[in-house]
């Protein structure tokens, strides 16, 4: 089997396409190419050399086996710099005796990283402000604004189990409707207000490949119950930052009190 690479034997293959088109986000450009083995021997097309208008050579991976004189459609995938701006990029490739046009159609790619994505808020005093820092990285190929976020959710992690248990024990014999009524009233009673969110850098532009340290102020609701397990989250583009509230109030141990 003859190996066709960007260095040798590329004259043995051809392509039916007048223009080879690869399309997608910069990290994953895909396109279907119909290769023709113009020789009487089995060949492996490993890769091809693509020539850019900036006089740069780019190796295009292929990886297809062709039997003698076989014609086969093959999906090609190519990765560019992840920060390559959206647009159309024209190149050429030598296939046999013909130089073919290669069109790379780069689409918008939103890719972000947040660190950390889980926080601990130490203290549930009413109206307490927690200040946190989060690193926001733009890993895509378009400009992104730091979003203006107003609030995040907060809820007691045991709200469903506790109120369902109370409803079943208290009014289970009075029928399903009565039980559900007690359950929903308990849920409503235990619901908390939102956590207020403020990001100092809101509105700033983060270029592709850049990162910015965000200063986030989080104000807990004025009314929270002691010794409850509160948790919540807020959305940041397509990701979520989660947080857990820790009550710093010491819990009295009944057994210890008895021993005294």
Where are these regions (language model features)?
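Buried hydrophobic-core signal for structured, non-transmembrane domains
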Residues: 31-36, 76, 89-95, 131-137, ...
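Extracellular/luminal low-complexity segments enriched in Ser/Thr/Pro
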Residues: 76-85, 188-190, 216-226
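Surface-exposed binding patches on compact interaction domains or structured appendages
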Residues: 2-17, 36-76, 141-212, 216
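Extended, hydrophobic interaction surfaces within ordered domains
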Residues: 63-96
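Beta-strand elements of well-folded, non-transmembrane domains
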Residues: 37-39, 52, 80-82, 95-97, ...
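Terminal connector regions
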Residues: 83-109, 222-257
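Surface-exposed loops/turns
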Residues: 25, 68, 85-86, 126, ...
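Beta-sheet-dominated interaction scaffolds and their linkers
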Residues: 1-40, 109-143, 149, 256
């Amino acid at each position: 089997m003859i190996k066709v690479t960007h260095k040798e034997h590329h004259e043995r293959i051809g392509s039916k396409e007048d223009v080879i088109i690869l399309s997608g986000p910069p990290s994953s450009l895909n396109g279907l190419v119909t290769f023709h083995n113009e020789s009487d021997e089995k060949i492996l097309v490993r890769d091809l050399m693509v020539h850019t208008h900036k006089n740069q050579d780019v190796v295009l991976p292929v990886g297809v086996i062709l039997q003698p004189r076989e014609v086969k459609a093959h999906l090609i995938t190519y990765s560019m710099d992840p920060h390559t701006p959206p647009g159309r990029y024209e190149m050429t490739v030598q296939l046999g005796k013909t130089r073919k046009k290669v069109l790379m159609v780069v689409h918008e790619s939103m890719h972000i990283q947040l660190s950390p994505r889980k926080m601990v808020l130490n203290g549930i005093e009413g109206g307490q402000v927690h200040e946190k820092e989060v690193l926001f990285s733009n890993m895509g190929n378009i400009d992104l604004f730091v979003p203006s976020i107003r609030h995040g959710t907060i809820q007691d992690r045991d709200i469903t189990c506790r109120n369902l248990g109370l409803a079943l024990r208290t009014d289970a014999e009075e029928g399903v409707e009565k039980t559900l009524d007690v359950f929903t009233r308990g849920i409503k009673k235990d619901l908390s207000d939102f956590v207020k969110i403020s990001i100092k850098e809101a509105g700033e532009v983060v270029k592709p490949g850049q990162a910015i340290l965000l200063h986030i102020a989080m104000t807990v609701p004025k009314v929270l119950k002691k010794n409850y397990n509160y948790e919540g989250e807020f959305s940041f583009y397509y990701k979520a930052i989660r947080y857990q509230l820790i009550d710093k109030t010491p819990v009295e141990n009944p057994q210890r009190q008895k021993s005294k």
